[in-house]
Every structure is written in structure tokens, then in C-alpha cells.
Amino acid sequence: MEDASLMCWGDNSNGQLGDGSRSERHVPISVPLGGAGVHEVSSGSYHTCAIMADRSLRCWGDNWHGQLGDGSFSDKLSPVDIEIPSNSSAVTVDSGAFHSCVGMNDGSMYCWGYNSYGQLGNGGTTRAGIPMPVPLDSTQSPTDIQVGLFHSCALFDSGEMSCWGDNAYGQIGDGTPISGGWHLPKTLVLDHEVLSISVGHRHSCAILTDASLQCWGI
């Protein structure tokens, strides 16, 4: 919205609309944010996360797997502040089916929620109810993060792209599908630098600097 407010509508069984209820809404309703403006919003299957105008992070809705990041594992019907263990500002956020990831302006990246396929990128498969750091090359800074069903991808300011998590259908893009998934980010080998990325449930796509489009997965 022009005034940086946020409006949501549709299913609200887990409080994903953020209006303090579980009632579905058939027309857009305003999300109460105490006058704070919204910079970016991302909706998962049953939860929502937003970067505020001051670059802080709030999430709400389904929290069964800890995908809100507040450490509680209980649904939140209204936006709650998410504490990122970094003295930096949120740049980009994406909400997947049951996990979320955020990139910070100091080049760090954090993920939380469901992790059975390593989609949090921290080397393990244990779910996390609070943001967990993703180990990255110190020379890279994430400019975009895209989260699928059970995998995640990030675009860096270097023009490189990394993916991690479920790879049963080749959605990581390294040419070696495995059912267990990759638990740490893997840098993809592409013909050119990457301009833009998008991730679906079980596939991924990238626009390259030669204006070509490449996709993989199912």
C-alpha cells in the first residue's frame, strides 16, 4: 500500500492474516501493526512474515514447526517481534511451507522452522524455533532468499546462487538428486551470473545475465 500498511485476506485457520482471530476474510482487512510501516511481506502455507519499515522482523500464524521464530511453537494470531541474533537490519525474507529465512544487511542469513531435509542450511536436521545462522562465505551477502516446500535458495551480490535442503527431485540443481537432501548451502555452477531467482514447492528457476531462464526439479 502507498501508506506502507498491510492488508490480508482468505483462510485464517492458523491466524495467518494477523488480525487477532481465526476467522476467514473474504475481503482485504488491515493487519494491526501499531502504526509501523511494512517494507516487505512473505506468506507461507499457513504463516506470514514481514520486514517492517525500520527493518525489524515480525511473523504470525501457524507455528507448529517453529516457523515464526519466536521460540514458542504455538500459533500467533497477531504479529510478534522476531529477535535476530545480529546487530543488523533485515533485507529480504521468505516464508515457505513450514520454515522461514531472512537475509541481513551485514551479509548474514538465518533460517528457522521445519528442518527434516536440512532446509535450514545449518548442517543438521533438527527443527529450530528461533533463527539459526546459515554458514556462508564471508565475502557473500544475500540479496534475495526463496524458500520452497522443503528446500531453500539464496542469491548473492556476487551473482552466485546457492541452494540446500530436499533434493529428491533435483530441485537443488547440482545434478545429483538424493532423498536425504543437502544440509548446507551448495553453490550452483551456471553459465552466467544470476539476476533473479524463484523457488516453487519442488523446483527452482533463475534468470541469468544473458537474459536466459534456467529451471530444474519437478
List where the protein language model places each region:
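Short glycine/serine- and acidic-residue-enriched loop/turn motifs that recur at repeat junctions
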Residues: 7-27, 61-78, 110-130, 162-184, ...
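Structural WD40 beta-propeller signal
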Residues: 1, 34, 44, 51-52, ...
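Conserved core positions of repeat-based scaffolds
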Residues: 8, 47-50, 59, 99-102, ...
